[in-house]
Regions:
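Solvent-exposed beta-hairpin/edge-strand motifs
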Residues: 212-227
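Carbohydrate-binding surface patches
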Residues: 172-216, 261
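Conserved, mostly hydrophobic/aromatic
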Residues: 7, 52, 125, 193, ...
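Catalytic cores of secreted or luminal carbohydrate-active enzymes
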Residues: 119-170
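C-terminal beta-strand-rich structural cap/linker in extracellular carbohydrate-active enzymes
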Residues: 231-268
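Active-site neighborhood of glycoside hydrolase catalytic domains
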Residues: 1-119, 129-138
Length: 268
């Protein structure tokens, strides 16, 4: 075994320690966690090459104590891509993406019934320990081919997604129905930005995506395009995200729950 997902979706009711006097019964929960740490300590020492993943739902322990033994945790059993944007955005305030268990799940989502594209689901899950949470035997040939491409893409950029410098660029507090994330390599050679449009609207304003963390003196391409931009331009003037006004101009009007991805590469 190389990997163990440690889950425990079970309540502890009528908590009581037979070895504790009445005035120490409130210590039960604390002592229980010390026992979990002790078990983790013995297991990780006996099997140092096994990756343990803990769970936020199973025991509600997404904290630094558990991360010492299990450096990866399942953020939530809510796997809807749109819900997960909010969950992972909040998680990012305390933990790096390499710690987030983030999977593409089936649709309609089993908790909220929402339909989202497999493209958007993957673009949310890329920021984290990427995987799939679905029955592969029910996938269409097209979906199977898409998943192969997604896995290959993630393997190519896994270190950047998990260990790059992570930036929160936009939230619905600052932008209408939008979240924006970015990860930048330590050498500022490569960056990947993501813009999540939750609900679409008619006649959108011109959209510019403002990067962070690039080298202002270097020059970059976006999505292997022919145009070259300085890092200063991408961070201060932003990158123009084309949008159409209606289906008379293009049949590809983005729908609700759309995600744009920007792969930025230095050319000097």
């Amino acid at each position: 075994l190389d990997y163990i997902k440690w889950d425990m979706n079970r309540n502890i009711t009528e908590m009581y320690g037979a070895d504790l006097p009445a005035d120490q019964q409130l210590e039960f929960s604390h002592r229980y966690i010390l026992g979990v740490y002790d078990l983790y300590d013995r297991l990780t020492k006996a099997f140092p090459d096994v990756l343990f993943e803990s769970c936020a739902s199973g025991g509600g322990r997404f904290d630094l104590g558990m991360m010492y033994y299990a450096p990866q945790a399942w953020c939530s059993d809510d796997t809807d891509a749109i819900e997960r944007i909010k969950i992972q955005d909040g998680t990012s305030y305390g933990y790096t993406p390499s710690m987030w268990g983030a999977h593409v799940s089936a649709v309609p989502n089993d908790q909220v019934g929402r339909l989202t594209s497999i493209d958007t689901r993957a673009k949310v899950a890329y920021f984290g320990a990427f995987g799939y949470e679905l029955d592969v035997t029910e996938l269409s040939d097209e979906e199977q081919a898409t998943i192969k491409q997604q896995v290959a893409f993630y393997k190519q950029y896994r270190k950047l997604f998990q260990f790059g410098t992570f930036y929160r660029l936009e939230t619905p507090d600052t932008s209408d129905n939008v979240y924006g994330w970015e990860t930048v390599s330590p050498d500022k050679q490569t960056a990947i930005g993501m813009r999540y449009q939750i609900l679409n609207g008619a006649n959108p304003a011109y959209i510019r995506y403002y990067f962070k963390g690039l080298d202002p003196e270097r020059h970059y391409t976006v999505n292997d395009g022919s145009e070259v931009f300085s890092g200063a331009e991408l961070m201060n003037a932003g990158y123009f995200v084309p949008r159409v006004m209606n289906r008379l101009q293009s049949p590809k009007v983005p729908s609700d729950f759309h995600a744009d991805m920007f792969i930025v590469k230095a050319v000097d």
